A protein has these predicted regions:
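Glycine-rich phosphate-binding loop
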Residues: 72-89, 223-257
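Short glycine/threonine-rich loop-to-helix capping motif typified by GTGT followed
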Residues: 61-64, 204-213, 239-246
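Buried hydrophobic positions in well-ordered alpha/beta secondary-structure cores of metabolic enzymes
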Residues: 21-24, 78, 140, 182, ...
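Short coil/turn connectors at secondary-structure junctions
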Residues: 10-14, 75-79, 109-110, 132-136, ...
Length: 257
């Protein structure tokens, strides 16, 4: 007796495609090809909509990175597939970034920047003696606050007394949700280990506060091991001992590094 094949219900997602600048324009066609192949394999339909703004070419023509109704245009999408932003020969980097990508992150509250680090079969590794399976960890970067703010200013500009102030902003809400995401991720993995990227020996107010927040969140995850490492030695150990890491939780700047 033949049994009917099970069919996977098709799902349709609307994807905003923004190639942006430079390498973004080069890699986006191949990125879409891979994404469409994966979608076909898993019974997903992607409805892609390409937007030519959020680029320095658009800025050169319009004096801004995006149209005024950019958020309305993107709000109906399920995801944003973004290439790259920046062309400093024509637009200062802080103008292009704050005029596009950072707006996406803040306006849509994209508070997790998840960065997988994994060595695949067939990919040469610059680290001696490493093989697939030896390197497999995540960096969980806070994506909406922290060191990347526009709070501050310049005083006495152009004089010998010139002062520059730029402030970092951390909230209990922002730190807790980042840390909980990291611990939940670690809970789903065999090593069950979270490393906090910190610098509490030199940044004497905000980083000890982050250490404390991690200790508090860790109380709800007794099966997870937590350790804290200063960002300078942490980056060195990523190269020297990459296999020791599982999930790394980091502020906006440290996660970017």
């Amino acid at each position: 007796m033949n049994t009917p094949e099970k069919t996977v219900p098709s799902r349709t997602y609307r994807i905003a495609v923004l190639p942006g600048d430079g390498i973004g324009k080069e890699v986006m066609p191949e990125g879409l090809r891979v994404t469409q192949a994966a979608a076909q394999r898993f019974g997903i339909t992607l409805e892609c909509h390409t937007f030519e703004w959020a680029s320095c070419d658009y800025y050169a023509e319009h004096g801004k990175m995006m149209p005024d109704d950019w958020k309305a245009q993107l709000s109906g999408m399920d995801a944003i597939f973004f290439g790259a932003v920046g062309w400093p020969a024509t637009v200062p980097d802080h103008v292009s970034l704050w005029g596009s990508l950072l707006k996406f992150r803040r306006e849509f509250d994209q508070y997790i920047n998840l960065r997988p680090v994994r060595l695949f079969e067939g990919v040469p590794c610059p680290l001696a003696g490493r093989k697939p399976g030896d390197i497999d960890y995540y960096v969980v970067r806070e994506n909406t606050e922290g060191e990347y703010t526009s709070l501050g200013g310049v005083m006495y500009e152009g004089t010998d007394r010139e002062i520059v102030i730029q402030e970092s902003v951390y909230s209990r809400h922002g730190a807790n949700r980042l840390l909980k995401f990291a611990f939940d991720l670690a809970q789903s993995r065999p090593k069950k280990h979270v490393t906090l990227a910190t610098k509490s020996n030199g940044i004497a107010i905000s980083m000890p506060w982050w250490d404390k927040r991690a200790d508090e969140v860790a109380k709800d995850y007794p099966e997870i091991t937590l350790d804290k490492q200063h960002i300078d030695i942490l980056t060195a150990r990523f190269v020297l001992q990459p296999g020791r890491f599982d999930v790394v939780a980091a502020t906006n700047l440290f996660g970017d590094i």
